């Protein structure tokens, strides 16, 4: 038996419940992603792999096998029939199943799909298979796959994940007498929640209007404020006692990753 779990994001299209089902949006920009089994790893936008501390599993004859690829979402209905369509090496496979429920030990109820007796895909040693796309439809009607316009797909993904690459750009900043350098990042679309923040540890530089400068590791920032289409970042400028001044922050090669992806 193999067990697959597909989960559904907000802002779905008319029929396909999945975002980035053809894997074209890859804001992190890596060519490969590795899951060591200790935590959930996100790869291309909206898709993750995990074998540890999760109810999601792929099993064969009761034995857990490879890490499942999954997408989290919140509109699955228990008792409703769903149809998954998957194209592997351009061969289209379909399967319909009724949604069920799973009670966790924290008294949360998870709705999931269990696929029994699915098509088996044989991979020879050192061989590869290409998943062209995955669609999920409510009901038993299978719709023809429509590749989403990249710009639209990117905006839908950016509600959950936004990656800003500095690439030498500069932004206005405020350097205030409490000893902080503050600048605002404008988002291309509203994120679904206040995101977490990580960076690639590259150096950014604050320069005041008096040409005084201070460099910082980009990961030292604090997400100070989150608004409808903006994020305000704060860095410990350490110039205590100075009057409020206007300056510029040079992002250099820093990459800022803001994520609302489910854990």
Where are the predicted features?
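Extracellular and organelle-lumenal recognition/adhesion modules and their flexible linkers in secreted
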Residues: 2-263
């Amino acid at each position: 038996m193999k067990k697959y779990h597909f989960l559904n994001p907000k802002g779905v299209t008319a029929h396909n419940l999945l975002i980035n089902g053809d894997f074209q949006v890859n804001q992190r920009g890596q060519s490969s992603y590795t899951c060591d089994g200790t935590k959930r790893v996100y790869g291309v936008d909206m898709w993750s792999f995990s074998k540890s501390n999760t109810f999601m599993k792929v099993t064969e004859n009761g034995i857990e096998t490879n890490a499942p690829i999954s997408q989290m979402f919140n509109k699955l209905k228990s008792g409703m029939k769903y149809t998954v369509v998957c194209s592997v090496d351009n061969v289209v496979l379909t399967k319909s199943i009724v949604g069920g429920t799973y009670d966790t030990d924290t008294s949360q109820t998870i709705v999931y799909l269990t696929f029994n007796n699915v098509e088996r895909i044989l991979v020879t040693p050192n061989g590869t298979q290409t998943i062209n796309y995955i669609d999920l439809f409510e009901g038993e009607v299978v719709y023809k796959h429509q590749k989403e316009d990249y710009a639209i797909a990117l905006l839908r993904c950016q509600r959950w994940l936004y990656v800003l690459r500095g690439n030498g750009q500069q932004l206005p900043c405020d350097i205030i007498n409490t000893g902080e350098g503050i600048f605002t990042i404008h988002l291309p679309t509203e994120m679904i929640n206040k995101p977490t923040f990580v960076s690639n540890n590259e150096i950014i530089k604050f320069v005041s209007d008096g040409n005084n400068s201070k460099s910082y590791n980009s990961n030292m920032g604090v997400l100070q404020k989150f608004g409808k289409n903006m994020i305000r970042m704060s860095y410990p400028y350490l110039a205590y006692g100075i009057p409020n001044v206007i300056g510029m922050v040079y992002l250099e090669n820093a990459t800022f990753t803001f994520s609302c992806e489910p854990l």
